[in-house]
Amino acid sequence: MRFSKTMRFSICAALALGVAAACSGAAERPLRGPFPLLVTPWTEDAKLDVPTLVKEAEFVNRCGAGGGIGPSAAEVLGNLSMDEYRRGLDALAARAARPDFKARLTAVCPGRSSAEALTRARLVNELQKKHNVEMALLARPPDNATNEAAIVAHYRALGEVAECPVIIQTYNGKSPQQSVASIVALAKEFPHVYGWVKEESPGGLVNGRMAELVAAKPAIKTVFSGWGAKGWLYQGRRIGTEGVVTQRAPYADLLVYIWRRIENGDADHTLLDAYSKLLLMYNLGDTLGGGSDSMRGPHLYVLQKRGIFTNRLTRVHAPKGAKNGKKWEMKDVPLSDLEKAEIDSRLEAVKPYLLKGEICPRD
């Protein structure tokens, strides 16, 4: 069959549009709702427990979360080797490629330097192609970024490398705060990469910055709450954040329940009670050890109770001069019968807001 010059031009244009659509398809799929960071599971012999990590991601997906993020940022640079990072993400990507997995698999993409973070981004590109899966990145500034120019330079370099949406995390505890104007400028320069922001500035700045970012739509597509969802009720209802990025995977179904009530204007008037139950579970860390910002400690028991984790172990660096020159040691979370009874009682109170059929007290 012969085509006229006009027909050939039309076919080429259509093919070009198709390629562009394929490249930007991930960006067009909304990223919103709860994005829990997965709690990293360990084996008794100090290895990353990859099957349990996948099981945790499956739980987050069943709960209806918008995404699942792994591995935990603090553990990436502190405890997790690059090989473990790769193996964990590879297994998660393979699972996320199956049709029943709707949550957006999101890879934490930190780095001591910009180069290290870009290495992680290239790995994600590789895994997306290998498994034919759409992913996203959660990217904070590199640890050695000492001024805004360095932060912006890193994100521009990442914008050239990343082949999926990037959620900018605005705070890493080390670098200065990036301006809202520069975040918006990046979203306009790289519209298929940027425009999603986890805003968690320190102190009293966060709510005002969120309002500025929400006002910058459509360049800014989604503003997520952070800081453990502790300000999410106000930020979601009054400012307009459209989800939360937080280390709260044991309570993914509770996060989804809260999110749906924020979305529908609290049609059944249960939002305040559900949110209070989330804070009730956070308080376990303050009461039984670990603090309210960590999902280890007593929350590992919750993951056990819900049939996700098999132990309550955490891998930590062995002290200098340790016997046999071992690099790691495993720390357990001992809980008395009284402490377990307290956790069980609180889970029972939260049960009306948890996903039916999931393992919890008296299921």
Residue ranges, per PLM feature:
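Bacterial N-terminal signal peptides that target proteins for export
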Residues: 1-12
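Bacterial N-terminal signal peptides
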Residues: 10-20
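Bacterial Sec-dependent signal peptides at the C-terminal "C-region" and cleavage site
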Residues: 18-28
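Active-site beta->alpha loop and helix N-cap motifs at the rims of alpha/beta catalytic domains
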Residues: 28-176
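C-terminal alpha-helical cap/extension of soluble enzyme domains
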Residues: 36-41, 64, 237-239, 248-363
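Buried hydrophobic positions in well-ordered alpha/beta secondary-structure cores of metabolic enzymes
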Residues: 46, 60, 92, 158, ...
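Short helix-capping segments at alpha-helix termini
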Residues: 95-102, 128-131, 162-164, 189-193, ...
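Catalytic alpha/beta core domains of metabolic enzymes, predominantly
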Residues: 171-292
